[in-house]
Structure formats: structure tokens, C-alpha cells
């Protein structure tokens, strides 16, 4: 198995190549396609049954899919709005904060659970199929204060991919909201990645990918072993970079990279 350090080295090399390509190529269409795939897979992890094509029709064409629930439609629409909000944050160089987190969660649950959208939970919760028991509600504010303190201290010295993975895992583990913690955590992870110029990291919603994701999280939560989770996220970022570059014209890539040397 590869080490985190070796994957991060490959990530840095590919990121440098992508930065060169972005100076000369329009990548808006690619970015939009990957955003649709991200929100499809993120919702799929949580049990949404819309297909990738149906998701695209709902968010881009405004269609209603027969046989699918209103909640599933709203989850897709809200996720798209959350990504647009994140894009605005990145373009305006707005840093992660408690206000930003609650805004993102509020968008995720908009029209689904108005009472709890953007609000820390007031009830204890248990996660089906997990040995991890999220903290009691009275502990949440102190834990979330520590969450943002960690971010502000770590953002200047951790590799961006490791930072994104840490903020993802820590938020899922604290589980501050009554619902939407997973989707919000994956959005926060990608907010950080986008802020540092990386493409969206997509975690698959198929059974094997979902189980690998849950198992890596469980290992952090029950054994305090972060290696598998950080490795998983790093591999997703590496794949995203490889895919992004490969989608672009091979000849144009070769020309641009040669010209930059």
C-alpha cells in the first residue's frame, strides 16, 4: 500500500501541471460536469436514489422525476445551491468559519427541515451501523469552537489535502447537526480543496466505495487512527487531478507543458 507522503508528492506534481493548463484552457464545462457527479455521489451515499442522469435533469433542467420523492429532488437542488455558494466563497476568498458552516448546512436542509437547518442539534443521536456515539448536545458548542480553532492553527502548516481530510472527519465525528452531517462535511472538505486550487474530490456512492469510506471513518472514531481516512481522501484527490488533466486535449496539454519548461 502506498504511503500518504508518496501520494501527496504525486498530487503536488499533478497540481502544478493543472495550474499551467488552467492558464490557457477554459475548464468551466469540465468543472460543471464534475460538480453534478459530486453532488450525485454525495447524495447517493446518504441513500438518494436519483440516477446521475436524473440528477442532471433535476438541477439543470428543472424536471420532476416520476417515482422519486420530493425530498430526493430537494437534496439534489440544495446540493447544487451549496456548490454554487462554495464557488462564491472561493472567488471572494472567504475563509471557513462557523457562520460559513451553518450557511452551508442551512442550504443542504433548505425546504427539508427548516427548524434544524443551520442549527446545532439539541438532541442526542446514534448512527445506525456505527460503534461511534456522537457527543451529547451540551458539549457541541465547545467542540465546534475547538474545531475552528484547530482549522485556524493548522491551515498554515498542514498540506491542503490533509487539512481537508481532517476537517471532513472531525465534523462527521462531532456530528453537530441532527441531519445532513455527511453531505455538509464533504462540502466543507471540497471548499478547502477548491480554496487551494484543487478539483472536487468525489467519494463514490456505490456499495464498495461507501463501505470503504465508512470503515475509514469508523477507524478514526473508534481507534483514533486517521491514516486510512487521510489516505482515502488523498487517493480521491489524486484521481480527481488525473481525471481532470486527462479530459483535456492530450496534444494541447503536451504543448502547454513543453512551453512552460
Give a label for each model feature.
Residues 1-261:
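FIC/Doc superfamily catalytic core
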Amino acid at each position: 500500500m502506498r504511503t500518504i507522503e508518496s501520494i501527496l508528492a504525486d498530487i503536488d506534481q499533478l497540481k502544478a501541471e493543472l495550474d499551467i493548463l488552467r492558464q490557457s484552457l477554459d475548464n468551466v464545462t469540465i468543472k460543471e460536469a464534475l460538480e453534478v457527479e459530486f453532488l450525485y455521489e454525495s447524495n447517493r451515499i446518504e441513500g438518494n436514489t436519483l440516477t446521475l442522469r436524473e440528477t442532471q435533469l433535476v438541477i439543470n433542467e428543472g424536471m420532476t422525476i416520476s417515482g422519486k420523492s420530493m425530498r430526493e429532488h430537494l437534496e439534489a437542488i440544495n446540493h447544487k445551491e451549496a456548490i454554487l455558494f462554495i464557488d462564491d466563497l472561493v472567488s471572494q476568498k472567504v475563509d471557513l468559519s462557523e457562520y460559513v458552516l451553518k450557511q452551508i448546512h442551512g442550504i443542504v436542509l433548505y425546504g427539508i427541515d427548516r427548524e434544524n437547518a443551520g442549527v446545532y442539534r439539541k438532541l442526542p443521536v446514534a448512527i445506525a451501523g456505527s460503534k461511534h456515539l456522537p457527543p451529547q448536545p451540551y458539549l457541541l458548542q465547545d467542540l465546534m469552537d475547538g474545531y475552528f480553532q484547530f482549522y485556524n492553527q493548522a491551515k498554515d502548516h498542514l498540506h491542503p489535502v490533509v487539512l481537508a481530510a481532517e476537517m471532513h472527519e472531525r465534523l462527521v465525528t462531532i456530528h453537530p447537526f441532527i441531519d445532513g452531517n455527511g453531505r455538509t462535511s464533504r462540502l466543507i472538505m471540497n471548499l478547502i480543496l477548491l480554496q487551494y486550487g484543487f478539483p472536487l474530490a468525489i467519494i463514490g456512492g456505490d456499495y464498495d466505495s461507501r463501505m470503504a469510506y465508512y470503515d475509514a471513518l469508523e477507524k478514526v472514531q473508534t481507534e483514533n487512527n486517521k491514516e486510512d481516512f487521510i489516505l482515502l481522501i488523498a487517493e480521491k484527490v489524486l484521481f480527481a487531478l488525473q481525471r481532470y488533466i486527462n479530459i483535456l486535449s492530450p496534444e494541447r496539454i503536451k504543448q502547454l507543458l513543453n512551453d512552460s519548461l
